[in-house]
């Protein structure tokens, strides 16, 4: 077993002792690779060749544990068929991204995330060079020195890049220019899907490129043409913004149980707002109730030592129940609504998909994370955390003095800005689905405190358990004045 540091190595060793299993534990902080290489110096190459030839395509490639956003993590058994077949098909699916002498990928998602591991396999099957960012704190200089041509990221990263650029513009003329350029990018991208941009729009786009887009591309290394996004939905507005800037975001959809994207938009035909059609070798169907099911080369063999979970995971005819709900359009492109388990049913019987509200609200520069709540309650509300990195610049841009997150959580101007953001968010849904109240938390959600997964998804069950008293206070204070929808 390989661990990141000595502390984890000690924990694994203690667990193996308690289980009475003989396990060799290596810490990467203690020359683990050198020790393994040394141990293998005297092994006959014939033995290595025999072991290699003994492998079969349906043998276990890796056991990857699910993120546990809604429950206890489970060990997903992935096979060599998954690890070889889907990346092989993926290279032919998006050759414009993966083929060419100058192709370069910089990975900054942790390899604990199955999507990052898949992209590494995909890149090896394609052309070019793969680089790894050792620390996200050095991501910007790493991007500028490595000059990647494509990236893998989660939507939250794209949201933060946009918000940082908006905040950096400051106020006054510079801010007006940035927001004008953003509007031009979005309009230009939408026009590409319709009759094409007009002459005046093309001229405005060229001007915006000189003033804004070229600088933004330079921040990311100057050569990024494509961004593969997964792990959650990206708002259509941001998708159009990035394409208008010159970096097409190819949204995909997959699970740990599918080793990588079961569906993904292509470089040739992308529908912003969808997660694309099934990758070759995979099939997707949607039941009459909207449940998404997958079958094909990427689907895992089952959960390790968990017959009960396996029975729940697969249909009688062998399709994987994803637990997500959505729809397929006439061209076979998949659109995600949300997780079935995360659907909120209000006291009035209204079904509410929290992801739609959370994704829109998280686009505000002050907001770090959002959890929408309201199950069995008379109305929908939200828990909001502030982005500590963005807060100082936002305060400066709005002529406010420096303050801590704790102070900002009670500040009238900050609360008023969040209230306006909630109002804009509510424009996307009906009144019964709208957020009527919110609370600002003083602690953010992180991996360290157990409220975020490595792909920056909120562990909803853990967050609701930790802040149950805050949720209770929302409904206690509003119960007498808020009608049930």
Descriptions of predicted regions:
Residues 7-57, 165-213:
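ANL superfamily adenylate-forming
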Residues 84-104, 111-213, 223, 248:
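Conserved AMP-binding/adenylation subdomain of ANL enzymes
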Residues 61-87:
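Conserved AMP-binding A3 loop
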Residues 369-372, 378, 419-485:
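Conserved C-terminal "lid"/linker of ANL adenylate-forming enzymes
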Residues 278-346, 363:
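Conserved ATP-binding/catalytic segment of the ANL
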Residues 299, 333-362, 391-411, 431-435, ...:
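Adenylate-forming
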């Amino acid at each position: 077993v390989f661990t990141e540091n000595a502390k984890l190595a000690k924990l694994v060793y203690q667990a193996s002792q308690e289980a009475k299993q003989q396990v060799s534990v290596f810490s990467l902080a203690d020359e683990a690779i050198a020790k393994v290489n040394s141990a293998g110096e005297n092994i006959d190459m014939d033995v290595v060749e025999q072991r290699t030839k003994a492998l079969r395509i349906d043998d276990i490639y890796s056991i990857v544990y699910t993120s546990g956003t809604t429950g206890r993590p489970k060990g997903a058994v992935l096979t060599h068929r998954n690890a070889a077949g889907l990346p092989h098909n993926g290279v032919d699916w998006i050759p414009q991204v993966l083929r060419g002498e100058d192709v370069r990928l910089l990975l900054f998602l942790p390899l604990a995330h199955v999507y990052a591991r898949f992209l590494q396999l995909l890149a090896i099957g394609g052309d070019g060079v793969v680089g790894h960012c050792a620390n996200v704190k050095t991501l910007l200089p790493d991007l500028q020195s490595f000059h990647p041509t494509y990236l893998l990221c989660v939507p939250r990263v794209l949201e933060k890049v946009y918000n940082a650029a908006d905040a950096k513009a400051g106020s006054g003329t510079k801010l007006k220019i940035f927001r004008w350029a953003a509007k031009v990018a979005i309009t230009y991208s939408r026009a590409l899907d319709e009759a094409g941009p007009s002459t005046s729009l093309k001229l405005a786009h060229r001007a915006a490129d000189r003033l804004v887009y070229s600088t933004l591309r330079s921040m990311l290394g100057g050569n990024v043409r494509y961004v593969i996004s997964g792990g959650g939905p990206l708002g259509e507005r941001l998708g159009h913004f990035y394409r208008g800037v010159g970096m097409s975001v190819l949204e995909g959809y997959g699970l740990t149980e599918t080793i990588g994207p079961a569906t993904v938009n292509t470089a040739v035909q992308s529908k912003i707002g969808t997660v694309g059609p099934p990758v070759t070798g995979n099939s997707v169907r949607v039941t009459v109730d909207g449940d998404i099911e997958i079958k094909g080369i990427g689907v895992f063999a089952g959960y390790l030592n968990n017959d009960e979970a396996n029975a729940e995971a697969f249909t009688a005819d062998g399709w994987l129940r994803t637990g997500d709900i959505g729809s397929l359009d006439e061209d076979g492109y998949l659109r995600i609504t949300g997780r079935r388990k995360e659907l909120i049913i209000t006291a009035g019987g209204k079904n509410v998909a929290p992801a739609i509200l959370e994704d829109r609200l998280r686009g505000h520069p002050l907001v770090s994370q959002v959890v929408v709540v309201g199950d069995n309650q008379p109305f929908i509300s939200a828990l909001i955390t502030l982005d500590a990195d963005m807060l100082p610049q936002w305060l400066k841009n709005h002529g406010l003095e420096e303050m801590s997150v704790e102070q900002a959580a009670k500040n009238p101007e900050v609360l008023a800005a969040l209230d306006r953001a909630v109002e804009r968010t509510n424009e996307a849904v009906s009144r019964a689905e709208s957020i009527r109240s919110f609370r600002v938390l003083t602690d953010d959600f992180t991996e360290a405190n157990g409220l975020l997964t490595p792909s920056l998804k909120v562990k909803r069950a853990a967050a609701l358990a930790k802040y149950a008293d805050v949720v209770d206070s929302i409904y206690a204070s509003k119960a007498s004045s808020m009608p049930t929808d």
